[in-house]
Amino acid sequence: MAFYDSFDVAVCGGGHAGIEASLACARMGLKTILITQSIDSIGRMSCNPSIGGIAKGNIVREIDALGGEMGRLIDRSMIQFRMLNKSRGPAVQAPRSQADKIVYSSLARHVVETTENLSTLMDTVVDVLTVASDVPLPKDSSGSLESGSIPGEKRSGSSYAFATQACRSGMRQKIIGVVTERGRIIPCRAAVLTTGTFLGGRIFIGEYDAPCGRLGESGVFGLTESLSRLGFTTGRLKTGTPPRILKHTVDFSRFELQEGDKKILPFSFDDEKIERPM
């Protein structure tokens, strides 16, 4: 093991959430490190390269209002804009943009790499290091630990094992660092896990399956077990990707062209007009 520089915050994962988390911390003056498997994959849009849609479009504007970057990134990488549900009332209308995903990722990487207080590291976090804090977990009037104060305790009718002996004794756990796949120990006061679909990931192609993150990228193995040891419960979600087809096998004459809107509403409140990528 080799010790790395210490940080206030370690953000694990360079997708949309990791970008916003690392930028927010760094802009508040916290010494931050963004740890990602590949610098080239920061902000990578995996499947349908779009931002916004029902509910999600509102969230993007809320992120922008809080100082986030997603709205500005999509405004600068947009290739088509549509306001969904224009025939219905304003309550269900939602902005959505298709992005040039190469440009989006490139812009996101540039912002990350040029932000003060923010460092990047190509590696994979596989373990979270904690110690018992000197701050006790909250107790109720009878002196028992309050419901919900321990990760993994009984809740909503389901029973899970307590986290660690320290939790059983009523002591909080506090983050002291993370461990990476390449044997680095990175001391930090807080860790933000934005791992997306990579934790213990598997890919299924027909009857074939194998450990994987995205196609051609490694999954993350070890971090799930680390969280389980701390008392967190984990589950598995599934995402499906439509098959890719060869362009020359498609008869585009049978398709109906769907134009974008001429009136474009920027996602960012800072933008008055849209600069499309060349």
Regions found by a protein language model. Name each.
Residues 4-15:
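Beta1/beta-strand and adjacent pyrophosphate-binding region of the FAD-binding site
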Residues 5, 23-127, 182, 194-214, ...:
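Conserved N-terminal/central alpha/beta ligand/cofactor-binding core
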Residues 8, 176, 189:
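Conserved acidic residues
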Residues 11, 21-22:
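Conserved phosphate-binding elements of NTP-dependent enzyme cores
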Residues 18:
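N-terminal Rossmann-fold NAD(P) dinucleotide-binding loop
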Residues 129-132, 171-184:
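Conserved beta-strand-loop-beta-strand element in the redox core of flavoprotein oxidoreductases
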Residues 133-172:
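Intrinsic disorder/low-complexity segments
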Residues 187-195:
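Short hydrophobic core segments
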